[in-house]
Structures are given as C-alpha cells and as structure tokens.
Amino acid sequence: MLYMLTGSMAANLYAMPRMTRDLDLVVAVSAKNLELFPALFPEEHYYLSLEAALVAVQDFSCFNLIHLATMIKIDIMVRKPEAYRVHEFSRRQLHKINDHPIWVVSKEDLILSKLEWARHSLSERQLGDVRNLLSTECDFEYLNTWAKHLHLTDILTRVTA
C-alpha cells in the first residue's frame, strides 16, 4: 500500500516540533486494497470500521484507525485523483524514524496543504505551522507556482508578509 505521512507529525520532521494528538496519512488505496487492512491492522490492536473506509475510498475522503493500546488516532485520507494530489504524492520523501523508513510529504507540499486547510478552516494553528515551516529553507519557486495554481497566493502572501 502506498502512503505518506502528512500533517503536524510530518511538520515536526522539518521544523520546530509541536505537540500533536494524532497521525495523518494519505494513502493511495482502492476498494480492493481494503481487503489488506484487517491483516495490516488486526482488530486486537486497532479499531477500524471497514464500512467507513469503503465510503472514504468511494468519496476520496477520510476514515480513522485507533491504536487501542495507546488510543492514538490515525486519520487516513484517501488520495484524491486531482493532478496536484498525484504530483504531491510523487514527490514524497523517504525519511528514517527510529531506523524505520517512512514516506513523508515534501515540506513544500505540506505547506500548500496546510494553507488549504487554513483557508477552509480559518485555523490559526495551521498558519502557525506554515510560518514555522517557512522559517526553514524552502523552494519558494515551487511554492509560488503551485500556490497560484491552487488559488492560495493570497494566503501565502499574507503568511510570508
């Protein structure tokens, strides 16, 4: 199954860490691939609603896993078929966390995603994460190109001002 870590946990790899309560994963998954989930996430260790997962796959939305021992929630977002989302997924980067290889969204694509979330939710936390990420080295040409394409130029300009 193809995946990438995104959200605040990914941001913690690129910039000053902040506390977060969950994990966010983007997965490239089909209804047929869902058959693998019970083996990957056995019910004695995880709560998973296959019905909710199937709806999420059909709608390109999200569903949750909960690790029962720690009660950590994992938000699983089904990768959308839009050109940018496919491109974003192709740019994911392999990181090592505690000697485990983990696919992670690129820093610039994470910034763009957080700008999108902030635009829709008006979340100051997302904008704070963006400012934190922008305080490190970034590919501004890439950011500006995709911000224009995704209609995020105004919010990116506001955050960088």
Residue map of PLM features:
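Compositionally biased terminal segments of proteins
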Residues: 1-161
